[in-house]
Structure formats: C-alpha cells, structure tokens
C-alpha cells in the first residue's frame, strides 16, 4: 500500500535529508505520471521503495522508474512486463551491478533491444568504459556483463535518458557530465519519444 511504501521510502531517504513532504511530493509527481500512462502507480511506488532501499536517492529513483516505464512503452512491453523489469533492476541496483541474469529478465520483458543497449553504451563511454572493445572481445553485449561494468550509476543515469528534461536534468547537466551537443540532442529526443509512447498509449 502507499502508506507502507511511503514509510519505507522515508526510512531509506531520511539520511539524505529527505522528509515526509519530499516523499509525498515525489509520489504525487509519480501518481500524475501513472495517470497519464498504462502503468500502475502502486507497483511504481513499491519499486521506488526497493530502489531507495538499494541506496538510490529519491529523485534518481523517481526518474529511473519513469525511465523504465517509458522504455517499456517504446519497446511495446505490457505494464506487467514493465513491473517485472522494475523489480529485477531494483534487485540489480541493490547488488551494485546488472548481471547477465538480470539482463535476461529485461530481455524477457521485451526491453533489452537495441534502443536500450545503445543508450547504455553511450553512458558507458562517457564513464570511460571501453564498451566497444569489450563487445568485440566478448562477442556480444550480453557477454560483457560478466565484467561488471553495468553499475547502478550507469543504469540509473541511462534510465533517466528515457525521461523528459526537468529543472535539474537538462542540457546543462548532461554537458557537465561530458556529453557532446549531438549526444545531448539525441538523448533529449529519445526522452520526448519515450514519454510520448508511454503517455499516448492511453488515449
């Protein structure tokens, strides 16, 4: 229930200085988003609880959940599949890296295609990971996961790329991270396309 989830989220985020108002405001934002989409607010809230329990801050958790839902929409996955992916990725976040087993469940949810792989590879390169060489050496994207490069940070950062720009996440913040103008334009467009896919399904 939302009450339980709120308590869980608050307990997990108090250490970063979050209070009940912050949690309620984050959940309100998510509720508004859920209303526009086919995705279930209760499941999203529960998954935010799991994300924050894994040490992901409140804001990043909200964006990651939205990102997963938007990614599910452009991948043509159902809300049930999105929920499975949210759960599996929250488990991966708790462990610190996405392993092959976690990735397989993302693939089974219909969300492990080229779009997500390319987005993850772009983030990896910004973090100085020689992902292209790794793929050449290992033979495929999935085989590189045993190297442990797909960390919580790379995952949550990439998921945010499937959401629309905000006051705190925008051209400026991406530029500071080292993305080029061209990459920023691509990321912005992907966020718009993915959000459209998630919110227009319902109408």
Residue map of PLM features:
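Compositionally biased non-globular segments, especially hydrophobic aliphatic-rich helices
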Residues: 37, 127, 197-201
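Helix-boundary capping/turn motifs
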Residues: 39-40, 59-61
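H+5 position of the DHp
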Residues: 37-40, 78
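Small-residue helix-packing and pore-constriction motifs in hydrophobic alpha-helices
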Residues: 1-34, 43-54, 63-74, 84-150, ...
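Hydrophobic, low-dielectric interface segments
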Residues: 16-17, 63, 172-203
């Amino acid at each position: 229930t939302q009450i339980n989830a709120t308590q869980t989220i608050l307990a997990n985020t108090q250490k970063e200085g979050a209070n009940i108002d912050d949690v309620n405001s984050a959940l309100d934002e998510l509720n508004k988003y859920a209303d526009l989409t086919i995705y279930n607010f209760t499941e999203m809230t529960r998954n935010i609880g799991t994300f924050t329990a894994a040490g992901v801050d409140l804001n990043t958790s909200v964006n990651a959940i939205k990102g997963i839902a938007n990614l599910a929409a452009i991948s043509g996955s159902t809300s049930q599949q999105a929920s499975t992916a949210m759960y599996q990725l929250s488990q991966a976040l708790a462990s610190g890296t996405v392993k092959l087993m976690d990735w397989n469940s993302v693939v089974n949810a219909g969300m492990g295609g080229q779009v997500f792989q390319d987005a993850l590879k772009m983030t990896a390169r910004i973090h100085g990971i020689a992902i292209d060489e790794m793929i050449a050496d290992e033979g495929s994207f999935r085989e590189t996961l045993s190297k442990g490069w797909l960390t919580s940070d790379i995952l949550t950062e990439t998921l945010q790329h499937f959401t629309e720009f905000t006051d705190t996440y925008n051209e400026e913040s991406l530029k500071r991270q080292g993305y080029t103008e061209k990459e920023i334009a691509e990321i912005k467009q992907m966020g718009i396309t993915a959000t459209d896919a998630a919110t227009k399904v319902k109408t």
